[in-house]
C-alpha cells in the first residue's frame, strides 16, 4: 500500500466517523469503569429506562458514557447489545484488569491513542490533532479548523457548525482544565498535559515536546497499532517521518517532535 493509498483508506475511516455524540461532556473520573461494568451485567443497559438510576448519572450523561466507551474501544456491539471488548476486559476488569480505576497515566495514554484507531466515534479528535497547526487557538478557531477539514467528507459536511463547535469546546476541556474544577467533574486526560495555556490566558496551545509520563512501551504499541491499521501487511519497513507526521500517526496523536520520537524508539 502506497502513502496515497494509505491516505485514501484513512479518508474512508473519516467519512464513517461520528460527531457530537458525547453530549458536550468530556469523559469524567469513573465513567469508563462504570460503563464497562454496566455493560458486562446488562448488554442493553444504555437502552434501559432505569439506566440513569443504575449508572447514577443524568440521561445525557448515559449517552455520553456510551459514546466514550465506544470511542476508546472499551465496548463493542454484540449480537444482543454491547459487550466489553478485549481491551476493555484487559484494562478495566475487576479481577484481572491492568488498571481498573485508571490510576496509571500509561492507561490514559493508551486510551488516548484509541481515538486515532478506526472506527472513529469521535472523529473531531483526530481532525483536530491532525489539522490544527496554529501556535495557539481558542475553541472557535479550533471549530473552524475541524469544520473545514470535515468538508472534504460528504457525511461530515452535512453536520452543522454548531456540532463542530461543541466538539471543539469538548476537546479543549478534555485536556485542559482552565477553571481548576472539582476532580469529580474534571477529565482524567487533563493529566496528560497535551494542551496548555498560552501566554494569552484566553487561548491554549498543543504541548509539542517530550511527554514525561508517556512510557516508551505505550508509544511502541501505538506504532505497531498504526502500522496494523493504516499500512499494507506486505510493508516490511516504515520511515520515522511517517510515524511522526503521517495522518493519525503516533507522532500526531502524542504531539511529539521528530527528535523526541526518535528517543522513544531508541
Predicted regions located by residue number:
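Donor-sugar nucleotide-binding helix/loop cap in glycosyltransferases
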Residues: 2-4, 8-266
Amino acid at each position: 500500500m502506497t502513502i496515497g493509498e494509505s491516505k485514501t483508506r484513512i479518508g474512508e475511516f473519516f467519512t464513517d466517523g461520528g460527531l457530537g455524540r458525547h453530549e458536550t461532556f468530556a469523559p469524567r473520573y469513573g465513567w469508563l469503569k462504570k460503563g464497562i461494568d454496566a455493560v458486562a451485567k446488562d448488554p442493553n443497559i444504555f437502552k434501559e429506562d432505569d439506566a440513569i438510576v443504575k449508572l447514577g448519572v443524568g440521561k445525557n450523561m448515559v449517552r455520553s458514557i456510551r459514546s466514550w466507551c465506544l470511542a476508546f474501544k472499551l465496548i463493542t456491539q454484540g449480537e444482543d447489545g454491547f459487550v466489553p471488548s478485549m481491551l476493555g476486559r484487559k484494562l478495566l476488569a475487576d479481577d484481572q484488569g491492568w488498571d481498573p480505576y485508571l490510576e496509571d497515566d500509561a492507561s490514559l495514554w493508551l486510551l488516548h491513542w484509541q481515538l486515532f484507531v478506526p472506527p472513529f466515534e469521535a472523529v473531531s479528535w483526530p481532525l483536530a490533532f491532525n489539522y490544527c497547526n496554529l501556535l495557539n487557538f481558542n475553541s472557535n478557531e479550533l471549530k473552524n479548523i475541524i469544520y473545514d477539514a470535515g468538508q472534504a467528507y460528504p457525511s461530515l459536511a452535512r453536520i452543522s457548525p454548531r456540532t463542530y463547535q461543541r466538539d471543539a469546546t469538548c476537546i479543549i476541556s478534555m485536556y485542559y482544565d482552565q477553571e481548576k474544577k472539582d476532580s469529580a467533574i474534571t477529565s482524567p486526560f487533563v493529566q496528560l498535559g497535551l494542551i496548555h495555556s498560552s501566554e494569552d490566558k484566553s487561548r491554549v496551545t498543543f504541548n509539542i515536546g517530550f511527554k514525561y509520563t508517556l512510557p516508551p512501551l505505550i508509544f511502541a504499541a501505538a506504532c505497531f497499532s498504526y502500522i496494523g491499521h493504516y499500512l499494507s501487511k506486505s510493508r516490511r519497513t516504515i520511515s520515522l517521518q511517517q510515524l511522526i507526521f503521517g495522518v493519525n500517526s503516533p507522532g500526531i496523536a502524542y504531539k511529539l517532535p521528530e527528535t523526541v520520537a526518535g528517543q522513544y524508539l531508541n
